[in-house]
Structures are given as structure tokens and as C-alpha cells.
């Protein structure tokens, strides 16, 4: 036992963080234009004058942040962040990297708390948490390489012989092409799939019925033995969500994902109504 502890201490001494590098990679090739009502977006209700161009601006992935955490024993862990990569790079370079250089990657909980607490005044969500996540992923990647084990082993190991998965695409599109895409997933053997709903509060009652058409179209193709889910990307208001959920109730969805902005659940009296 004493030898084992000595070995663990030796590993900790060798696995100190010596550098943290953040780099933004930018896509410079052609970009396919996103059509109107591709998917709902939380910014829709404030972008009325230019909604067709701005509908999906908050989720465009034309840049990508990659974080490298290098250890004293020569391992390099990789992490990444897709949303707001440029601001996240600034957070990593200015706040996170100086705070964790010299720490052992095996003290990962201490490192996480250190990053979180040093960004608490302006962090706690958004860019701050995204930057912390990118570094945290890189640390776990370095841990796996150092231990010569896949990270899932370090997190507790296998609990099942296999895991269910679902097809997650089915963005709003003409109904015939939506049906074809759903049929392709059935042919591939998927027993669950998730679609995106393209209309929100600014589209009124007509948009509600268009959302229902999307769901009914997919359901008619996949049948009742396939789980069906829908994602809204926080594009609805409380009032709209309540009205839509009454219409959706008969469509046998397994879940409705992110109907409203999550933090509003803690500040609005309507939260209990939506939950019920």
C-alpha cells in the first residue's frame, strides 16, 4: 500500500500542467445558406426586421476553439468549444491558463473549482462556463493518455453492454423531403429520432399548425414503435409553449427539448404552468 501511494505521488509530480494553449480555427470555405424556419431560435422575437438572415446566427459554427493542456510528462490533452470561440479563447488565455499552470492534472476537482471561483463575478454560465468546459475536457483527455485508459474508465467504467442512440437531425424542411429523411433513419435501424420545430411565437397560430404538420409527417413515416422527440432551442415564450404543448399532447412525443430559455424558469410565475 505504501509503495502504491508513493507511485501515485510520483505520477502526480510528473503530471503537472506546464502550458495551456487556445487556438481558434476558422472555416473559410463555402457556407450553405440556411432557409427561413430552419429551426426556432431564442433571438427570433427580437429580430423581426431581418428574421430570415438572423434566424440562426447564434448557433453558426464557422469557428472552433481547440485547447491544448500539456503536462510535465509530455502528454497533451485536447478540449474544444464550438460556441463563441473568440471570447472563450480570451477567457482561457487571460484567466484560466495562469490559474492552473503548475497544478497536477490529477487534482482535477481542485482545478475545476479554481477556474469556476476565479471567474465567479462575471461567469457561472455562458462564455465563462464554455471556456472552463474546454479546459476541463482537455484535462480529462490528458488524464486518459497519462493513465493509458479511455476516459470512460476513469469516470467509473462500463455500466451496460450497449447504449441506445437516436438520429438527431430532421430540421424543418418541405414535408416530402422531411418524410424521406425520416424513412432513411428507419431503414438504418434507428428506434428513436429527434426533429426540430421551425415556427415560434412570431409566427402565430399558422406557425403552430406548421409545427404540428412536421411532427405528424415524421410520425406517419416512422409509426408508433419509434420514439419521437422534438427540439425548439429555447425559441418559445411561456405563453406559446403552453399553447403548443396542448396541441402536441396527442402526438406521443417522448420529450420536448428546450421550449423556453432555461434561466427564466427561476424568475417567472409561469414556470409551474409550463412544468405541469
Name each model feature, range by range:
Residues 1-7, 11, 266-276:
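Single conserved hydrophobic/aromatic residue that forms the stacking wall/gate
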Residues 12-72, 82:
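Structured beta-strand/loop patches that form or line metal/cofactor-binding pockets in enzymes
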Residues 54-55, 70-146:
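Metal- or metallocofactor-binding catalytic centers and their adjacent structured scaffolds
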Residues 59-60, 157-159, 221:
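Solvent-exposed alpha-helices and their adjacent loops that cap or buttress functional pockets
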Residues 81, 137, 142, 195, ...:
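Generic detector of well-ordered alpha-helical packing
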Residues 127, 136-168, 172:
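Glycine-rich, aromatic-flanked loop segments that form ligand/cofactor-binding clefts
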Residues 162-265:
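Metal-dependent enolase-superfamily TIM-barrel catalytic cores that perform enediolate-based chemistry
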